[in-house]
Amino acid sequence: MDNRLLEILVCPLCKGTLQHDRANNELICHVDKLAYPIRDGIPVMLADEARQTVEGTPVDPA
């Protein structure tokens, strides 16, 4: 994921920042507890496509 793109993208629901979870290939919104998938290098920023995250699950930013 390009860092410049990550700086621009926000959660479509709350407009909050997102964190890239490289291990699961997702963008995480900690406010709404949603994980948006990245498919073929393209973030899918649709609430219907997001999954609920588990509270306290660590995100691998590396």
Swiss-Prot record:
Highest taxon of the lineage: Bacteria
Transmembrane segments: none
InterPro entries attached to this UniProt entry: Trm112-like
A Gene Ontology term for the protein's cellular component: cytosol
Pfam families: Trm112p
Annotated SUPFAM superfamilies: Trm112p-like
Family from the record: Belongs to the UPF0434 family.
UniProt name for this protein: UPF0434 protein Rpic_2808
Organism of this sequence: Ralstonia pickettii (strain 12J)
High-level lineage: Bacteria, Pseudomonadati, Pseudomonadota, Betaproteobacteria, Burkholderiales
